[in-house]
């Protein structure tokens, strides 16, 4: 099922429906828009009929120069069964030929008071967000010092309890248990919570709590870009864990690779503080300050100096 239909654009952007009401449930499957200027001149070989069509001042001014026969021909060619809608911008008058073609084809004809450039930008941003590839991940998403940290791990390892401690320390909860992730752009993942469990946190033995009610509106966020993954796992004595931080592990979600840190869990470890420091250290690395790399370089210099002596 398509995620966006023409009626969604009408509601989102307060568009005026001129005609073609029977077609407002037409699907929109691409975020690309079309301004059919070359089509107005009669070239329809590569006409992208499946896109939302925008008619601005330039297109309609040129349209006025055509003969009556050409006007009818061009508008019939524009209004296809595939076309989600045609939007006339700047509250311009709708040509009679376009109105007639819309009625005959059942294609929605809409009008907006916004300029073509402004409406085009807003439509593109809206459609890219709605049509972006999506997935769901079992975990907790928290905004820590501006870093979107996705905490993963097997059930019962302590993800929600750690998130609760982070919220108490002033950070913001985005989602618990199920994180809906959409790829809004290349290398850009945005996580949010399903509407049903938004702002809720499940603590074993305590039950479900409403974080916004308990800690205030400043303790939650509706969405956050994900830049770091921290995986919690029960401490395995046979496994060698990274002790320097030189090797950077990656995790792929949809088509984006994220930095992943594995934290072993055992009694006595304050996971909330460790995750806080991991987020701050991640920010430092992005700013060009890598403590592990600096230590490694100092160590190599000391070894070389010792060998020379």
From Swiss-Prot:
Residues 201-210 are annotated as: Important for the catalytic mechanism of both phosphorylation and dephosphorylation. InterPro entries: HPr(Ser)_kin/Pase, Hpr_kin/Pase_C, Hpr_kin/Pase_Hpr_N, P-loop_NTPase, Ser_kin/Pase_Hpr-like_N_sf. GO terms for molecular function: ATP binding; magnesium ion binding; phosphorelay sensor kinase activity; protein serine/threonine kinase activity; protein serine/threonine/tyrosine kinase activity. One of its GO terms (cellular component) is cytosol. One of its GO terms (biological process) is regulation of carbohydrate metabolic process. Residues 264-269 are annotated as: Important for the catalytic mechanism of dephosphorylation. The keyword Transferase applies. Keywords: ATP-binding, Carbohydrate metabolism, Kinase, Magnesium, Metal-binding, Multifunctional enzyme, Nucleotide-binding, Serine/threonine-protein kinase, Transferase. It catalyses: [HPr protein]-L-serine + ATP = [HPr protein]-O-phospho-L-serine + ADP + H(+); [HPr protein]-O-phospho-L-serine + phosphate + H(+) = [HPr protein]-L-serine + diphosphate. Homohexamer. Catalyzes the ATP- as well as the pyrophosphate-dependent phosphorylation of a specific serine residue in HPr, a phosphocarrier protein of the phosphoenolpyruvate-dependent sugar phosphotransferase system (PTS). HprK/P also catalyzes the pyrophosphate-producing, inorganic phosphate-dependent dephosphorylation (phosphorolysis) of seryl-phosphorylated HPr (P-Ser-HPr). This is HPr kinase/phosphorylase. The lineage of its organism: Bacteria, Bacillati, Bacillota, Bacilli, Bacillales. The gene is hprK.
């Amino acid at each position: 099922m398509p995620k966006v239909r023409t009626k969604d654009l009408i509601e989102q952007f307060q568009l005026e429906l001129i005609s073609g009401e029977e077609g407002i449930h037409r699907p929109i499957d691409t975020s690309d828009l079309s301004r059919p200027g070359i089509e107005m001149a009669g070239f329809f070989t590569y006409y992208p009929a499946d896109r939302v069509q925008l008619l601005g001042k330039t297109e309609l001014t040129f349209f006025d120069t055509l003969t009556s026969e050409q006007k009818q021909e061009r508008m019939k060619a524009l209004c296809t069964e595939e076309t989600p809608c045609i939007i006339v911008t700047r509250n311009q008058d709708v040509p009679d030929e376009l109105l007639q073609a819309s009625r005959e084809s059942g294609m929605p004809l809409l009008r907006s008071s916004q300029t073509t450039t402004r409406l085009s930008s807003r439509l593109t941003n809206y459609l890219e967000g709605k049509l972006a590839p999506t997935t769901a991940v079992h975990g907790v998403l928290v905004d820590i010092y501006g870093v979107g940290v996705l905490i993963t791990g097997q059930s019962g390892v302590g993800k929600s309890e750690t998130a609760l401690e982070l919220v108490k320390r002033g950070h913001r909860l985005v989602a618990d248990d199920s994180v809906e992730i959409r790829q809004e752009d290349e290398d850009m993942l945005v996580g949010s919570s399903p509407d049903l469990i938004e702002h809720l946190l499940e603590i074993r033995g305590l039950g479900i709590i409403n974080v916004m009610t308990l800690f205030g509106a400043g303790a939650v966020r509706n969405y956050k870009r994900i830049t770091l993954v921290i995986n919690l796992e029960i401490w395995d004595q046979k496994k060698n864990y990274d002790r320097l931080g030189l090797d950077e592990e990656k995790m792929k979600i949809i088509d984006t690779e994220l930095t992943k840190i594995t934290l072993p869990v055992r009694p006595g470890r304050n996971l909330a503080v460790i995750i806080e420091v991991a987020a701050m250290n991640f920010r430092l690395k992005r700013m060009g300050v890598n403590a592990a790399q600096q230590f490694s370089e100092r160590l190599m210099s000391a070894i070389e100096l010792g060998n020379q002596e």
